[in-house]
Amino acid sequence: MPTINQLVRKGREKKVVKSKSPALNKGYNSFKKEQTNVSSPQKRGVCTRVGTMTPKKPNSALRKYARVRLTNGIEVTAYIPGIGHNLQEHSVVLIRGGRVKDLPGVRYHIIRGALDAAGVANRMQGRSKYGAKKPKAAKK
């Protein structure tokens, strides 16, 4: 434990908090052509590649992902949630933070039902998370 004199000479160091979704903390000034420190909850981007990858060790599947170039110039890998999707190269998507635990390097999710990403078809529960509209009541 330090003495009071040691603390006066050299105080406690603050912990540096590292962001879990750093691409959302950068903006882009197109006039100055430089990045800015403007954070946002979501960002828009264009898909440069859409594909599947296999998860880490205990799991087995083909998880869908898209490589997205954001409006701030950063290119990230984002997960496409839900069953089936309509995304292809040059699709405009909205991404949010949130990693996929069994896919290394995937720190973002694509928001379904926004911009070019269609909602999940025939989804009844948890619809708001997948951009699915409320189904019409069946006529008697």
Swiss-Prot record:
Renumbered residue ranges of the record's region Disordered: 33-55
Keyword presence, Nucleotide-binding: no
GO cellular component, one term: small ribosomal subunit
Matching InterPro entries: NA-bd_OB-fold, Ribosomal_uS12, Ribosomal_uS12_bac
GO molecular function, one term: structural constituent of ribosome
Keywords: Ribonucleoprotein, Ribosomal protein, RNA-binding, rRNA-binding, tRNA-binding
Pfam families: Ribosom_S12_S23
GO biological process, one term: translation
Domain of life of the source: Bacteria
Function, in words: With S4 and S5 plays an important role in translational accuracy.
Family: Belongs to the universal ribosomal protein uS12 family.
Subunit structure: Part of the 30S ribosomal subunit. Contacts proteins S8 and S17. May interact with IF1 in the 30S initiation complex.
UniProt-listed NCBIfam families: rpsL_bact
Name of the protein in question: Small ribosomal subunit protein uS12
Lineage: Bacteria, Bacillati, Bacillota, Bacilli, Bacillales
